[in-house]
Curated annotation (Swiss-Prot):
Belongs to the SNF7 family. A motif (Type-2 MIT-interacting motif) lies at residues 168-179. GO terms for cellular component: amphisome membrane; autophagosome membrane; ESCRT III complex; kinetochore; kinetochore microtubule; lysosomal membrane; midbody; multivesicular body membrane. Residues 10-145 form a coiled coil. This is Charged multivesicular body protein 6. The gene is Chmp6. Probable core component of the endosomal sorting required for transport complex III (ESCRT-III) which is involved in multivesicular bodies (MVBs) formation and sorting of endosomal cargo proteins into MVBs. MVBs contain intraluminal vesicles (ILVs) that are generated by invagination and scission from the limiting membrane of the endosome and mostly are delivered to lysosomes enabling degradation of membrane proteins, such as stimulated growth factor receptors, lysosomal enzymes and lipids. The MVB pathway appears to require the sequential function of ESCRT-O, -I,-II and -III complexes. It is a lipid-anchor. It comes from Mus musculus. Keywords: Coiled coil, Endosome, Lipoprotein, Membrane, Myristate, Phosphoprotein, Protein transport, Transport, Ubl conjugation. GO terms for biological process: autophagosome maturation; autophagy; late endosome to lysosome transport; membrane fission; midbody abscission; mitotic metaphase chromosome alignment; multivesicular body assembly; multivesicular body sorting pathway. It is found in: Endomembrane system; Endosome membrane; Late endosome membrane; Membrane. Residues 168-200 are annotated as: Disordered.
Length: 200
């Protein structure tokens, strides 16, 4: 029982996942650094203006040199962020390619197993047997069709002519509508029937 609950689950996090996470964390740290430096640059620019207004030109020049150096750092930081993002995208795309390759490998193995079960020789054998069965059935059909004697053929033709003659002898259906039934006719038939019963 203790083994059931004490066993560690196998982690689903791969080395690639860890690498991507680290790269993204580095990228985020660089962006935070970028934001801090940008804010410092704005403050230094405002301070340089104030120094110029106060007549402290050398101090303002020194501050602007410092600002220029930080701007270069910002450019390098931007390049590093771009490199990190490119690396993340490359790893993610490689993961997709690996999944595709795994899928292709599984599909290939499946096809190979199917081909082992159904070899070309087996397919040819089945097709030959099917062709033989079709040919055999055709021969049976020919024998059955050819088994009729002249007497049988004459009897078949005679029966066909008789059916055709019966259809020709049937009366034609009238094209005009039938007359309405007379309501008095059934009453007369009943009274006639009553007379016959009384007479007997």
């Amino acid at each position: 029982m203790g083994n059931l609950f004490g066993r560690k689950k196998q982690s689903r996090v791969t080395e690639q996942d860890r690498a991507i996470l680290q790269l993204k964390q580095q990228r985020d740290k660089l962006r935070q650094y970028q934001k801090r430096v940008t804010q410092q640059l704005e403050r230094e620019r405002a301070l340089a203006r104030q120094l110029l207004r106060d007549g402290r030109k050398e101090r303002a020049k020194l501050l602007l040199k410092k600002k220029r150096y930080r701007e270069q750092l910002l450019d390098r930081t931007e390049n590093q962020i771009s490199s990190l993002e490119a690396m993340v995208q490359s790893i993610e795309f490689t993961q997709i390619e690996m999944k595709v390759m795994e899928g292709l490998q599984v599909g290939n193995e499946c096809l190979n197993k199917m081909h082992q079960v159904m070899s070309i020789e087996e397919v040819e054998r089945i097709l030959d047997e099917t062709q033989e069965a079709v040919e055999y059935q055709r021969q049976i059909d020919e024998l059955l069709a050819g088994n009729f004697t002249q007497e049988d053929e004459d009897a078949i033709l005679e029966e066909l002519n008789a059916i055709t003659q019966e259809q020709m002898e049937l009366p034609e259906v009238p094209s005009e509508p039938l007359p309405d039934r007379n309501p008095e006719a059934p009453a007369k038939a009943r009274s006639r029937q009553a007379e016959l019963v009384a007479a007997s």
